[in-house]
């Protein structure tokens, strides 16, 4: 049986119960990545000069191009080509595969996806600060932001590649790690471009407060994603990545997975969200658990998608059509990872082959 086939299996409930309340190093490698999402954003101008790649952003993003202050221009390290990044992809994917059973079966998929989200999600369109370009999460106050709690494990997981390849930037490493995570657990192909540069100027480290509060309502969610230029459909789509990983109380004061298949990229988040939920009685933050098994969780910002009519129609749409969800997510996630980065025409988007594809 291939690794991909193995991953497309649900984790038994007995294994889920074993993971709750554990206080060990593996249980901290969590999947609470979209609960504390995004700042705001603007697309790089050159993104629109490459519409032939089929990864065209929304009209909302086009409106955000004017008026940005800082220009973050990507540049591939001298002597490097996309082949070097495919090799790097493979090395990261092999390590992810080797730790497939970590965190009681969640693996590193949610952790690395959350890291890619949060390094990109500090972006602010008004002044073109934050985002994945500078790799600033290694500096305070971003590194100690409460919304980034637990992501030190993700950075540590990838650090060996930064140590091995001096030419590799943190921004490229962390965003590529997110691409690996999505693709290697059965998700869609994510177009990606290299060339982000590390920033040593600590005055450019974004302040805390750009990553949102998971306890809020639908209007709050719209405001957070609207600051990036995402509309309601794109917002719902991106939050659908909650199919991966789980929350850990020691990191976020939320606990548990969103469903039983937390090491597989599917539309299960939307299917489950449409089921019946109730407020969990416990000593942590307010969260919801499913009526059927009391085993899975939803955050208040998740439930907001169900309670707001402008969101709900897209929840139903993606619950009914996983293929459409995959297609939309591929575009939106790629957009997120590139917020604030200006790519010259010479740096084209690429799709990496998964390990299973290369084994054929």
Curated annotation (Swiss-Prot):
Keyword terms: Heme, Iron, Metal-binding, Mitochondrion, Oxidoreductase, Peroxidase, Transit peptide
MF terms from GO for this chain are: cytochrome-c peroxidase activity; heme binding; metal ion binding
| Enzyme's top EC category | oxidoreductase
One GO term of the biological process aspect: cellular response to oxidative stress
InterPro entries found in the cross-reference section: Ccp1-like, Haem_peroxidase, Haem_peroxidase_sf, Peroxidase_I
* Active-site residues annotated for this sequence: 118 (proton acceptor), 258 (tryptophan radical intermediate)
Q: What is its EC number?
A: 1.11.1.5
| Site features described as Transition state stabilizer, chain residue numbers | 114
Catalytic reaction(s) noted = 2 Fe(II)-[cytochrome c] + H2O2 + 2 H(+) = 2 Fe(III)-[cytochrome c] + 2 H2O
Q: How is the cofactor bound?
A: Binds 1 heme b (iron(II)-protoporphyrin IX) group per subunit.
Q: Where in the cell is it found?
A: Mitochondrion matrix; Mitochondrion intermembrane space
Gene Ontology cellular-component annotations: mitochondrial intermembrane space; mitochondrial matrix
- Which cofactors, if any, are listed as required? heme b
Q: Which residues bind heme b?
A: 242
Per UniProt, subunit arrangement is: Forms a one-to-one complex with cytochrome c.
> So what family is this one in?
Belongs to the peroxidase family. Cytochrome c peroxidase subfamily.
Free-text function comment from the UniProt entry: Destroys radicals which are normally produced within the cells and which are toxic to biological systems.
Q: What is the official name of this protein in its record?
A: Cytochrome c peroxidase, mitochondrial
Q: Could you tell me which species this protein originates from?
A: Debaryomyces hansenii (strain ATCC 36239 / CBS 767 / BCRC 21394 / JCM 1990 / NBRC 0083 / IGC 2968) (Yeast)
**What gene does the UniProt entry assign to this protein?**
CCP1
